[in-house]
Design a protein with these regions (language model features):
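Feature captures the catalytic ectodomains and active-site-proximal regions of enzymes
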Residues: 1-158
Length: 158
């Protein structure tokens, strides 16, 4: 590693494959505060033109170094409990230590001095769940990172 941010610029790839601006890559993390993440994340959704074969594009994206997973909307809705009307045709998740960007020219990383961090990937889901009192946990099969806020709120209200 040479210290440069490890980024897969998905919009650039799709522009090369499908033509400029034919597809649209949306990164839910859009905060341009470069000290943290430079508007790069580990999760992206892609809107494809009607003429594109989503399965072929997914297969192609899945072969790109740094990409952990590419799934279609139906699978993303089930796997991540997402609203189908608010995500694109494909969902992309990057590997650990890799971020996803739209286009190289849309991410100004010149001011990046601190190590880059990311959000939204599967490798960032494990969060320590530490409490200072006993709480009644549900009979859920597995707690997830976003459950921490729910249980912290309940504990604080007592």
């Amino acid at each position: 590693s040479d210290g440069d941010p490890a980024v897969v610029y998905v919009q650039d790839l799709l522009d090369d494959w499908l033509g400029a601006a034919a597809a649209r890559v949306i990164l839910p993390i859009t905060d341009p505060y470069v000290v943290h993440h430079g508007a790069l994340g580990s999760f992206a959704t892609v809107y494809l033109p009607n003429s594109a074969n989503a399965a072929d594009i997914a297969d192609r994206l899945a072969t790109v170094d740094g990409i952990m997973m590419v799934i279609d909307r139906a699978k993303a809705v089930m796997r991540f409990e997402l609203p189908a009307d608010r995500i694109g045709d494909l969902v992309i998740v990057s590997n650990e230590n890799i971020t996803i960007g739209t286009s190289r020219d849309r991410h100004d990383l010149a001011a990046l001095k601190e190590p880059l961090r990311s959000h939204g990937g599967l490798t960032e889901q494990e969060v320590p769940f530490i409490v200072n009192r006993q709480i009644d946990l549900p009979n859920a099969p597995k707690l997830r990172n976003f459950d921490a806020f729910h249980f912290a709120s309940i504990a604080a209200s007592k």
